[in-house]
Curated annotation (Swiss-Prot):
Compartment(s): Cytoplasm
HAMAP family, per the entry: RRF (MF_00040)
NCBIfam families xref list: frr
UniProt-listed InterPro entries: Ribosome_recyc_fac, Ribosome_recyc_fac_dom, RRF_sf
Alphabetized UniProt keyword annotations: Cytoplasm, Protein biosynthesis
Family: Belongs to the RRF family.
Role according to the record: Responsible for the release of ribosomes from messenger RNA at the termination of protein biosynthesis. May increase the efficiency of translation by recycling ribosomes from one round of translation to another.
BP-aspect Gene Ontology terms: translational termination
Name the UniProt record assigns to this protein: Ribosome-recycling factor
Protein backbone atom coordinates (compact mmCIF):
# COMPACT_ATOMS: atom_id res chain seq x y z
CA UNK A 1 0.00 0.00 0.00
CA UNK A 2 2.65 2.50 1.07
CA UNK A 3 4.90 1.60 -1.86
CA UNK A 4 2.01 2.17 -4.28
CA UNK A 5 1.40 5.63 -2.81
CA UNK A 6 5.11 6.50 -3.03
CA UNK A 7 5.42 5.18 -6.60
CA UNK A 8 2.33 7.05 -7.76
CA UNK A 9 3.51 10.25 -6.06
CA UNK A 10 6.99 9.96 -7.56
CA UNK A 11 5.55 9.37 -11.05
CA UNK A 12 3.41 12.51 -10.73
CA UNK A 13 6.40 14.49 -9.44
CA UNK A 14 8.53 13.35 -12.41
CA UNK A 15 5.79 14.43 -14.79
CA UNK A 16 5.59 17.82 -13.07
CA UNK A 17 9.32 18.43 -13.58
CA UNK A 18 9.07 17.25 -17.21
CA UNK A 19 6.15 19.62 -17.79
CA UNK A 20 8.28 22.49 -16.49
CA UNK A 21 11.14 21.52 -18.82
CA UNK A 22 8.72 21.48 -21.74
CA UNK A 23 7.30 24.88 -20.78
CA UNK A 24 10.80 26.32 -20.64
CA UNK A 25 11.47 25.19 -24.22
CA UNK A 26 8.88 27.70 -25.36
CA UNK A 27 10.60 30.60 -23.61
CA UNK A 28 12.87 32.33 -26.08
CA UNK A 29 16.40 32.69 -24.76
CA UNK A 30 17.91 34.61 -27.68
CA UNK A 31 18.84 31.42 -29.51
CA UNK A 32 17.04 29.83 -32.43
CA UNK A 33 15.18 26.72 -31.33
CA UNK A 34 12.58 24.91 -33.49
CA UNK A 35 10.54 24.27 -30.30
CA UNK A 36 9.67 28.01 -30.31
CA UNK A 37 7.15 27.32 -33.07
CA UNK A 38 5.46 24.29 -31.46
CA UNK A 39 2.50 26.30 -30.20
CA UNK A 40 1.99 28.24 -33.45
CA UNK A 41 -0.90 26.85 -35.48
CA UNK A 42 -1.98 27.57 -39.06
CA UNK A 43 -5.45 27.25 -40.55
CA UNK A 44 -4.90 24.45 -43.09
CA UNK A 45 -7.85 22.92 -44.94
CA UNK A 46 -10.17 24.30 -42.28
CA UNK A 47 -8.32 22.81 -39.31
CA UNK A 48 -5.75 24.44 -37.01
CA UNK A 49 -2.48 22.61 -37.72
CA UNK A 50 0.87 23.00 -35.91
CA UNK A 51 3.63 24.54 -38.03
CA UNK A 52 5.89 21.51 -37.52
CA UNK A 53 3.29 19.35 -39.33
CA UNK A 54 3.30 21.63 -42.38
CA UNK A 55 6.98 22.39 -42.75
CA UNK A 56 10.52 21.41 -41.98
CA UNK A 57 11.93 23.72 -39.29
CA UNK A 58 15.69 24.02 -38.90
CA UNK A 59 18.16 26.27 -37.09
CA UNK A 60 21.17 26.58 -39.44
CA UNK A 61 22.64 29.40 -37.31
CA UNK A 62 22.38 30.44 -33.66
CA UNK A 63 19.97 33.28 -34.44
CA UNK A 64 18.12 31.97 -37.49
CA UNK A 65 15.18 29.63 -37.99
CA UNK A 66 14.36 28.42 -41.49
CA UNK A 67 10.85 27.14 -42.18
CA UNK A 68 10.50 25.16 -45.39
CA UNK A 69 6.86 24.24 -46.05
CA UNK A 70 6.15 21.02 -47.91
CA UNK A 71 3.23 22.75 -49.65
CA UNK A 72 4.27 26.20 -50.98
CA UNK A 73 0.64 27.40 -51.03
CA UNK A 74 0.68 27.51 -47.23
CA UNK A 75 3.50 30.12 -47.10
CA UNK A 76 1.26 33.21 -46.67
CA UNK A 77 -0.79 31.50 -43.95
CA UNK A 78 2.42 30.50 -42.15
CA UNK A 79 3.68 34.09 -42.26
CA UNK A 80 0.37 35.39 -40.86
CA UNK A 81 0.33 32.81 -38.06
CA UNK A 82 3.88 33.72 -37.01
CA UNK A 83 3.05 37.43 -37.04
CA UNK A 84 -0.09 36.82 -34.93
CA UNK A 85 1.77 34.65 -32.41
CA UNK A 86 3.20 36.17 -29.23
CA UNK A 87 6.78 35.41 -30.30
CA UNK A 88 7.45 38.96 -31.46
CA UNK A 89 9.27 37.76 -34.59
CA UNK A 90 8.90 39.08 -38.13
CA UNK A 91 9.07 36.45 -40.87
CA UNK A 92 10.80 37.14 -44.20
CA UNK A 93 9.87 35.00 -47.18
CA UNK A 94 11.53 34.43 -50.54
CA UNK A 95 8.62 32.43 -51.97
CA UNK A 96 10.12 29.06 -51.03
CA UNK A 97 11.18 29.36 -47.39
CA UNK A 98 10.50 31.63 -44.43
CA UNK A 99 13.41 32.95 -42.43
CA UNK A 100 13.00 34.07 -38.84
CA UNK A 101 15.86 36.11 -37.46
CA UNK A 102 15.92 35.86 -33.68
CA UNK A 103 16.87 39.32 -32.38
CA UNK A 104 19.22 39.88 -29.45
CA UNK A 105 17.22 40.16 -26.23
CA UNK A 106 17.22 43.52 -24.47
CA UNK A 107 18.11 43.64 -20.78
CA UNK A 108 14.51 44.60 -20.00
CA UNK A 109 13.15 41.60 -21.93
CA UNK A 110 15.66 39.31 -20.23
CA UNK A 111 14.45 40.50 -16.83
CA UNK A 112 10.83 39.85 -17.84
CA UNK A 113 11.71 36.35 -19.02
CA UNK A 114 13.59 35.60 -15.79
CA UNK A 115 10.52 36.69 -13.82
CA UNK A 116 8.40 34.34 -15.94
CA UNK A 117 10.87 31.50 -15.33
CA UNK A 118 10.78 32.11 -11.56
CA UNK A 119 6.97 32.31 -11.57
CA UNK A 120 6.64 29.02 -13.47
CA UNK A 121 9.15 27.35 -11.14
CA UNK A 122 7.17 28.48 -8.09
CA UNK A 123 3.92 27.21 -9.64
CA UNK A 124 5.54 23.80 -10.12
CA UNK A 125 6.92 23.81 -6.56
CA UNK A 126 3.36 24.37 -5.34
CA UNK A 127 2.16 21.45 -7.46
CA UNK A 128 4.86 19.25 -5.88
CA UNK A 129 3.82 20.34 -2.38
CA UNK A 130 0.19 19.57 -3.19
CA UNK A 131 1.22 16.10 -4.36
CA UNK A 132 3.06 15.64 -1.06
CA UNK A 133 -0.02 16.72 0.88
CA UNK A 134 -2.24 14.30 -1.07
CA UNK A 135 0.20 11.41 -0.48
CA UNK A 136 0.43 12.22 3.24
CA UNK A 137 -3.37 12.28 3.48
CA UNK A 138 -3.50 8.86 1.83
CA UNK A 139 -0.98 7.55 4.39
CA UNK A 140 -3.01 9.05 7.25
CA UNK A 141 -6.15 7.38 5.88
CA UNK A 142 -4.34 4.03 5.96
CA UNK A 143 -3.36 4.73 9.58
CA UNK A 144 -6.95 5.61 10.52
CA UNK A 145 -8.19 2.38 8.98
CA UNK A 146 -5.49 0.53 10.95
CA UNK A 147 -4.01 -0.92 7.77
CA UNK A 148 -0.57 0.38 8.75
CA UNK A 149 0.95 1.26 12.11
CA UNK A 150 1.79 4.77 13.27
CA UNK A 151 5.53 4.07 12.86
CA UNK A 152 5.04 2.88 9.28
CA UNK A 153 2.98 6.00 8.61
CA UNK A 154 5.68 8.29 9.99
CA UNK A 155 8.36 6.49 7.98
CA UNK A 156 6.24 6.77 4.80
CA UNK A 157 5.70 10.49 5.39
CA UNK A 158 9.45 11.01 5.85
CA UNK A 159 10.13 9.18 2.58
CA UNK A 160 7.48 11.27 0.81
CA UNK A 161 9.15 14.41 2.22
CA UNK A 162 12.52 13.22 0.84
CA UNK A 163 10.91 12.70 -2.57
CA UNK A 164 9.40 16.19 -2.41
CA UNK A 165 12.76 17.73 -1.47
CA UNK A 166 14.47 15.87 -4.33
CA UNK A 167 12.01 17.08 -6.96
CA UNK A 168 11.91 20.64 -5.62
CA UNK A 169 15.73 20.69 -5.94
CA UNK A 170 15.32 19.44 -9.50
CA UNK A 171 12.83 22.24 -10.28
CA UNK A 172 15.28 24.75 -8.80
CA UNK A 173 18.13 23.39 -10.95
CA UNK A 174 16.03 23.47 -14.14
CA UNK A 175 14.98 27.06 -13.37
CA UNK A 176 18.56 28.15 -12.61
CA UNK A 177 19.80 26.69 -15.90
CA UNK A 178 17.06 28.48 -17.85
CA UNK A 179 17.79 31.77 -16.06
CA UNK A 180 21.50 31.43 -16.89
CA UNK A 181 20.61 30.68 -20.52
CA UNK A 182 18.43 33.80 -20.69
CA UNK A 183 20.97 36.09 -19.02
CA UNK A 184 23.78 34.85 -21.30
CA UNK A 185 24.63 37.70 -23.66
Amino acid sequence: MINEIKKETEDKMKKTVEALRKEYQHIRAGRANPALLEKVTVEYYGAPTPVNQLANISAPEARLLVIQPWDKSVLPALEKAILKSDLGLTPTSDGAVIRLVIPQLTQERRSELVKTVKKRAEEHRVILRNLRRDANEDVKDLQKEHIISEDEGKRAQEEIQKLTDKYIREVDQVAERKEAEIMEV
